[in-house]
C-alpha cells in the first residue's frame, strides 16, 4: 500500500523527507517556538516541550505576529527548523517564513492530512511539484 501520494498546492519549493509531527493547534512562531532549539515553549500548545527540528510539521495554519516569518528564518539559521511543513491552508506569515528559510511547504491537500497521517510516519514533501508522499507508517496514533 505504501507509498501513497496526495497532491496539494505549492507554497515553498524544495523537497524534504522526515518524521511527521502533528498539531491540530495553529502555531505562532514568535513566542511559541524557541528559535535557538526548535522546542515549542507555549505551555498550553499540544506540542509543548517537543522539538520541531528536522520534522515534517503538520498544523492547520499560523497565527500571530508578522515577526513569525523572521523567527522561522532564525530557526533555519540555527539548524532548528522543521524539514518541511504541511498546512491545511497557509497564511502569509508562514508562507513568507517558509520561502525565505527555504523550507518546503505544501497546503490544501486533496485529502485532509489529519485523516491519514500520524506522528512518526515518514513523509516526503515535494514543494517543487506540489505533493506529499507517505513513505512509511510509524507507530503513533492518527490525530483525529
From Swiss-Prot:
Signal peptide: none annotated. One of its GO terms (biological process) is isopentenyl diphosphate biosynthetic process, mevalonate pathway. The keyword Lyase applies. GO terms for molecular function: hydro-lyase activity. It catalyses: (R)-5-phosphomevalonate = (2E)-3-methyl-5-phosphooxypent-2-enoate + H2O. Coiled coil: none annotated. Keywords: Isoprene biosynthesis, Lyase. PANTHER family: DUF521 DOMAIN PROTEIN (AFU_ORTHOLOGUE AFUA_6G00490) (PTHR36577:SF3). Belongs to the AcnX type II small subunit family. Component of a hydro-lyase that catalyzes the dehydration of mevalonate 5-phosphate (MVA5P) to form trans-anhydromevalonate 5-phosphate (tAHMP). Involved in the archaeal mevalonate (MVA) pathway, which provides fundamental precursors for isoprenoid biosynthesis, such as isopentenyl diphosphate (IPP) and dimethylallyl diphosphate (DMAPP). This is Phosphomevalonate dehydratase small subunit. It comes from Methanosarcina mazei (strain ATCC BAA-159 / DSM 3647 / Goe1 / Go1 / JCM 11833 / OCM 88) (Methanosarcina frisia). The lineage of its organism: Archaea, Methanobacteriati, Methanobacteriota, Stenosarchaea group, Methanomicrobia.
Amino acid at each position: 500500500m505504501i507509498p501513497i501520494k496526495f497532491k496539494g498546492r505549492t507554497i515553498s519549493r524544495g523537497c524534504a523527507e522526515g518524521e511527521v509531527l502533528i498539531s491540530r493547534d495553529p502555531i505562532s512562531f514568535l513566542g511559541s517556538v524557541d528559535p535557538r532549539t526548535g522546542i515549542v515553549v507555549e505551555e498550553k500548545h499540544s506540542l509543548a516541550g517537543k522539538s520541531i527540528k528536522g520534522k515534517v510539521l503538520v498544523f492547520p495554519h499560523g497565527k500571530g505576529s508578522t515577526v513569525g516569518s523572521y523567527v522561522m528564518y532564525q530557526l533555519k539559521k540555527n539548524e532548528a527548523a522543521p524539514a518541511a511543513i504541511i498546512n491545511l491552508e497557509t497564511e502569509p506569515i508562514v508562507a513568507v517564513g517558509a520561502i525565505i528559510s527555504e523550507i518546503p511547504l505544501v497546503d490544501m491537500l486533496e485529502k485532509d492530512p489529519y485523516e491519514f497521517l500520524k506522528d512518526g510516519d515518514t513523509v516526503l514533501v515535494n514543494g517543487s511539484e506540489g505533493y506529499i508522499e507517505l513513505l512509511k507508517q510509524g507507530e503513533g496514533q492518527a490525530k483525529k
